[in-house]
Amino acid sequence: MANFISLKRNEDILNIIKKQQKIHSNHIVVYFCETNLKKVRLAISISKKKFKLATQRNRIRRLIKAWFIAANVLVESYDIVVLVKPSFIDGSFVLNCDNIKKILQTIISKHKQNKINK
């Protein structure tokens, strides 16, 4: 999972959110959609209204990227948008890492179900 590219264009992020495939937990919401690329494209959205300090937002971004690397789950050909909730700061690194791992496994299982149904 270490091979991911950052999604930067607002248009791309909005297209993923409009497709309405999402999984949520107490601390984050993950929108995803399948693509033809061989790599994962990742966007992390953190609201300035909820997290005032830039250092806090940057730390959250680094933690989320570290989770995706630490999760070590093979998800390919997906665009993923992560929205961070204000309750994010309350969770520990290990708990949130397990949470990301479960979310990625859910994405993989939905992907397998879609392939079976087609």
UniProtKB/Swiss-Prot annotation:
One of its GO terms (cellular component) is ribonuclease P complex. PROSITE patterns: RIBONUCLEASE_P. SUPFAM superfamilies: Ribosomal protein S5 domain 2-like (SSF54211). It is an enzyme of class 3 (hydrolase). GO terms for molecular function: 3'-tRNA processing endoribonuclease activity; ribonuclease P activity; tRNA binding. Its EC number is 3.1.26.5. GO terms for biological process: tRNA 5'-leader removal. InterPro entries: Ribosomal_Su5_D2-typ_SF, Ribsml_uS5_D2-typ_fold_subgr, RNase_P, RNase_P_CS. The keyword Nuclease applies. Keywords: Endonuclease, Hydrolase, Nuclease, RNA-binding, tRNA processing. It catalyses: Endonucleolytic cleavage of RNA, removing 5'-extranucleotides from tRNA precursor. RNaseP catalyzes the removal of the 5'-leader sequence from pre-tRNA to produce the mature 5'-terminus. It can also cleave other RNA substrates such as 4.5S RNA. The protein component plays an auxiliary but essential role in vivo by binding to the 5'-leader sequence and broadening the substrate specificity of the ribozyme. Consists of a catalytic RNA component (M1 or rnpB) and a protein subunit. PANTHER family: RIBONUCLEASE P PROTEIN COMPONENT. Belongs to the RnpA family. This is Ribonuclease P protein component.
